[in-house]
From Swiss-Prot:
<dbReference type="Pfam" id="PF17384">
    <property type="entry name" value="DUF150_C"/>
</dbReference>
<keyword id="KW-0963">Cytoplasm</keyword>
<dbReference type="Pfam" id="PF02576">
    <property type="entry name" value="RimP_N"/>
</dbReference>
<dbReference type="InterPro" id="IPR036847">
    <property type="entry name" value="RimP_C_sf"/>
</dbReference>
<dbReference type="InterPro" id="IPR028998">
    <property type="entry name" value="RimP_C"/>
</dbReference>
<keyword id="KW-0690">Ribosome biogenesis</keyword>
<protein>
    <recommendedName>
        <fullName>Ribosome maturation factor RimP</fullName>
    </recommendedName>
</protein>
<dbReference type="InterPro" id="IPR028989">
    <property type="entry name" value="RimP_N"/>
</dbReference>
<dbReference type="GO" id="GO:0000028">
    <property type="term" value="P:ribosomal small subunit assembly"/>
</dbReference>
<dbReference type="InterPro" id="IPR035956">
    <property type="entry name" value="RimP_N_sf"/>
</dbReference>
<dbReference type="GO" id="GO:0005829">
    <property type="term" value="C:cytosol"/>
</dbReference>
<comment type="similarity">
    <text>Belongs to the RimP family.</text>
</comment>
<dbReference type="GO" id="GO:0006412">
    <property type="term" value="P:translation"/>
</dbReference>
<comment type="function">
    <text>Required for maturation of 30S ribosomal subunits.</text>
</comment>
<dbReference type="InterPro" id="IPR003728">
    <property type="entry name" value="Ribosome_maturation_RimP"/>
</dbReference>
Length: 158
């Protein structure tokens, strides 16, 4: 059986399984090329919502590297890199939006789930529904229907 993949969801699950026992969650996994080199970039956050430190990145990287070496999920050579969410923080779960109430988010609908494409402040979160202040009105959407990221950098850690 060939277990090689370039599927980000498989890589996401592999990385998340390796780092979650250490108190981290994987926010996203992307693959990009720098010249001929393939880079697998893993963006993590701490489950306790404290800032991600360099020591955290090192620990997560070591755990994931061991698992990636064991499973060998990618056919070609690649470089596995880890980073904290920073200013490009993806907002994936209701609790991520809740932490950022008052800040602007860049929002777009997932394919087949509406026609949203806007940047607006996060006003409220109730269950899995996020309300934005958009065009002077409240606009509520389900977290599962959108892809969102922070559009402004917070003045303090949230």
């Amino acid at each position: 059986m060939n277990n090689k993949t370039n599927n980000n969801s498989v890589l996401f699950d592999l990385a998340d399984g390796a780092v979650r026992p250490l108190g981290f969650e994987v926010l996203e996994v992307t693959q990009q090329r720098e010249g001929r080199d393939l880079i697998v970039l893993v963006r993590i956050d701490r489950l306790d919502e404290q800032p991600v430190t360099m020591d955290d990145l090192t620990a997560a990287s070591r755990a994931a590297e061991a698992e990636f070496d064991r499973v060998d999920p990618i056919e070609e050579e690649y470089r596995l890199e880890f980073e904290s969410p920073g200013g490009k923080r993806p907002l994936l779960r209701a609790r991520h939006f809740e932490r950022m109430i008052g800040l602007k988010a860049k929002v777009r609908s997932l394919p087949g789930r509406g026609e949203h494409n806007f940047t607006a402040p996060i006003k409220a979160v109730e269950g899995d529904t996020v309300t934005f202040e958009h065009g002077g009105e409240d606009l509520s959407v389900n977290v599962a229907d959108i892809q969102a990221s922070l559009a402004e950098f917070p003045d303090r850690h949230r």
